[in-house]
UniProtKB/Swiss-Prot annotation:
The keyword Ribonucleoprotein does not apply. GO terms for molecular function: ATP binding; metal ion binding; protein-exporting ATPase activity. Pfam families: P-loop_SecA, SEC-C, SecA_DEAD, SecA_PP_bind, SecA_SW. This is Protein translocase subunit SecA. PROSITE patterns: SECA, SECA_MOTOR_DEAD.
Amino acid sequence: MVKILEKIFGTKNERELKRYFTIVEDINRLESQISSLSDEKLKQKTDEFRERLAKGESLDDILKEAFAVVREVAKRTLGMRHFDVQLVGGLVLHEGKIAEMKTGEGKTLVATLAAYLNALEGKGVHIVTVNDYLARRDVQWMGAIYNFLGLSVGVIQPDASFLYDPNYRLPDRRFDRLRPCSKKEAYLADITYGTNNEFGFDYLRDNMRYSIDELCQRELNYAIVDEVDSILIDEARTPLIISGPSEESTDIYYAVNRIIKYLKPENDFKLDEKLKTVVLTEQGSQKAEKLLGIDNLYNPSNIQVVHHINQAIRAHYFFKKEVDYVVKDGKIVIVDEFTGRLLEGRRWSDGLHQAIEAKEGLKIEAENQTLATITFQNYFRMYKKLAGMTGTADTEASEFAEIYNLEVVVIPTHKPMIREDYPDAVYKTEKAKYEAVVKEIEECYKVGRPVLVGTTSIEKSELISKMLKKKGVPHNVLNAKYHDKEAEIVAQAGRIGAVTIATNMAGRGTDILLGGNPEFLAREMLAGKDYTEEEYKKALEKAKEICKEEHDKVVSLGGLHIIGTERHESRRIDNQLRGRAGRQGDPGSSRFYLSLEDELLRLFGGERLQSLMHFLKIEDDTPIENKMVSKAIENAQKRVEAHNFDIRKHLLKYDDVMNSQRNEIYSFRKEVLESDSLKDKVFELLEIEIDEMVDFYLAQESEGVEKLKEQLSARFDIEVDLSNKSKDEIKEYLLEKLREAYEKKEQKIGQELMRDVEKMIFLHVIDTKWKDHLLGIDHIKEGIGLRGYAQRDPLVEYKKEAFELFEEMSRNIISDILTRLFKIQIKEESQVKVARAQKIQRSDGDGARRPVEKPKKIGRNDPCPCGSGKKYKKCCGKNS
């Protein structure tokens, strides 16, 4: 029935495209009118649009003209005109949807349309890229359009921030036209480019600031996420964590690592390769107890040891060197499983990183305690409007809709796609597969046809590299180890005779032009020389001629050939690799070479194929090439995708609990930060605290009143008479006494200083308690899986316990803030003068210096001078 209706009315995607192309026709009709405007008149359009918005028009009212203006400015500044399909892409982005546009269709240029239109509101637009190089490159490239139209453009990087300035010229092309600025300035720009990591971390950092002037980000208004599938799906489960060192010893990691070689799979522990989980058997537990000299591994005091053993087994059996991580300068550096890039500075959490350090015999860095954390899923769901672009999103359309409420619109290519995708070639062994891959590379190289080979790990790319060296085939290896030259290698991967081996999707974001990229070639020709703008232009002209000649030759050879050496768990990643060929109507082809020893086939249905090959007596070096086989593999991928989606959906339910708590704490913290006076808030908290204290102590039959008086004296320094008063009268009386005491303290300290002290104590207590809460949540997560064995729903139990923990934290925050405020002691003026005088070094008439008395050093076990009643090391001395 659905199919019949689709035939009559078209699919939803087709109906949407029809609507968009109608709007595009209206934009095209404005082209001649807009192109007749002078530069000056064109520049004035931005102010005109802003005035119209101020008078009550909406963005949709000015959309057609704004898009026509951006198209004209792109022609004048970059010599590039937006195609109709690119205008459709801009419309999709403006409506807060995902535009699926194939590789080479100009997504970078598409973003300028929606970014310009939405920036006119003055609330900020964030354009999110997958790496820092692309963020910088896109600002340098597209900055000319925004600058012409009077918009400011910023770019945030981990160690610096910049504003686009066409007059700021540098010989170093990486930073040319990028004027250094503060991070806050970059965020105040109309449009800000940066990576998902940087935007997310800045959000967390802002929620740890102690002054409103230090905040960088504005309200999260509108984001355009480039390579949206990579960021919102592949990295969705990755939490961004800001952490500080914990006080635990690292010896346990070495001790546990030493016993792993004595524990055997199956007998001592069970491995689940699909879920990457470990379970100790009864025999394994007893063996571990004996080896570690522990009586009972499951005694509550040893529960962390069980966790460390599990992580050590995972480190040895699931995490492979040169695949999941590399050892660099004595440190473990994670390899991104999706892009093959090195993730410098990133660490696995939960003790896994330390377990791998122990496995490799490296110095173990102490496990960090989480200070602030958020997942990409929850960060990006905070934007008022979210949109995205990618070459491959349709396979995950249901996930985008369900989790982010984002619709995917598949946009047709500007020119028909003529790439030929051959069926998979499946071999019995990995050895036979790689020999076939190298043979095919050799054949392409002999005729000069460029080849791009996609591998799933550094190890595999280096294996192919070794085999090619033996055959004398020159090639470039592009993996996590050499990502500095990534863009240059990818840009020239379409030249005659180029052989490029790329780990996974490294180099994403840079187009492979058949015949090569003239800009990169021109820079290569001038490498190591000081050159003028004129010399660069000449080199560029020469490079264009060379590339044009090579382009025609490569086209006649059939274009770029893609070889995949293994299927990824996700069809989308495979499609991304294929999508590197056949851009903008160019010819091209692709083929995947697989073996029954590949991980995907081994875990999902390789046995059936193996028995089929055995039954048909197929030789090791003879491949099966059959559409049915490719279909079976695709079905295996669909199963894995569905499985991974379920995991992400399930984890999101857990994370939503944390998310609502985070929002609660951060909005309270923001209220504190933005407040000029917290005095009313202090009195509000006093009412809550006195209510609870009186109810609690008066419920105790004997000595309740005396205990209440003791508490009031210890915490608030007040003596009270509670005789002959009802419960409500006691509450009213105590509030009156405490307000008086607070007013006196304020008079003594001074109004202005008291406001500063309030803010400092509020923020310090909130941060300390939130940090402790995050640790508590981690402990709940560790044990929650065991609830399933007691026939309880772990999610329900987690929600209940997390809520109780949050309630407890909220009570502790109120209690701690009030105790500290009432205990605070400020030195009197005379004491301050004496203290200052002691610090000044006076000299005698003969020039000899008098000894300066050192103030008494506070010992770590001394009472904290802030008056909290805690030891100095557990309070203000914690971070000393």
